[in-house]
């Protein structure tokens, strides 16, 4: 797992696992935003698994699934609102970290 810093309060990453949560928490991340729909890939953990691990380490999880290449203006607006209201720093993740 590689965290890419966008600014002081926002990071992106490819798919994370429950085992990554300790490292993420140690980096000071407070909120995870999952942009990957559950079931998109056979090898991905679902958001519930990530959320359970995150809660054990005091992290918040927001689930905003979007389909790669089909992100709507409404979803962009929703993401902006979720980010603005989230406890920071925020890590948004999907399969590649590019959504």
Predicted regions and their residues:
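Cys-dependent protein tyrosine phosphatase-like superfamily
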Residues: 1-90
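A phosphate-binding catalytic loop at a beta-strand-loop-alpha-helix junction
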Residues: 90-99
């Amino acid at each position: 797992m590689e965290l890419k810093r966008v600014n002081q309060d926002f990071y992106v990453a490819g798919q994370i696992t429950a085992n990554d949560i300790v490292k993420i928490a140690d980096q000071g991340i407070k909120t995870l935003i999952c942009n990957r729909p559950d079931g998109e890939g056979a090898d991905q953990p679902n958001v519930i698994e990530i959320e359970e691990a995150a809660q054990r380490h005091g992290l918040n999880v927001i689930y905003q699934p979007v389909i790669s290449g089909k992100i709507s203006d409404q979803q962009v607006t929703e993401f902006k609102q979720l980010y603005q209201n989230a406890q920071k720093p925020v890590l948004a993740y999907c399969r590649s970290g590019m959504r």
